[in-house]
């Protein structure tokens, strides 16, 4: 493996040289939050929005994070990497316990960790599986507590799929690592934000840009049948960009490859953020 630039508690090292305590609350309780900051053609995509979301996640867990220091470390990682295209993964945990305990001591220090890797933003068509959303009730926090996502995503892979689209009580929430959009002939739809949906940065950017372009978009509550009636479905994330769904496993659909509204949204996103 190549030497991957990383930082742990303010010290820059290669990823393989970093040692983390097994009593880190990130390790024992997933008591941590994270952010993924993409950059393309040496330009960071929506840096301030990503930092704001990380701060919001920290605030939700009562982490007193030094946002200025975190921002500086993320920028330093990107500069050290010499990659034109990639992303930074950055994580903040409550810290290291003297011994494992559900109740934490307020005196422990926050633990920070990040690394940078190369990534090419190449659009890929996906086969997805629809599944029940079995995650916890605060998916709006970008927490590392992702076991529900992990189990669903690996079940999808074992069944020949690339991703999942989840529903709770038959209402569409989000993908395993993405937000969901779909379209019919003249309108784009996406589930409204709630405690069951992460406020995706790519989701936010896309909504802003397509509104400015005059494309009709509706946020609301949509069920599985609404999704399956769609002419186009796509997923969005910081690493996927816009990824078109070509098949919903085991379901009859009306999907049109490269539907005009998907192509219009894709062109807008690529022009504004990936070129």
Predicted regions and their residues:
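Helix-start/capping segments and mature chain N-termini
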Residues: 1-76, 98-275
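Ordered, amphipathic secondary-structure segments that act as subunit-interaction surfaces
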Residues: 80-92, 99
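Short, well-ordered beta-to-alpha junction loops that form the rim of enzyme active sites
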Residues: 92-93, 169
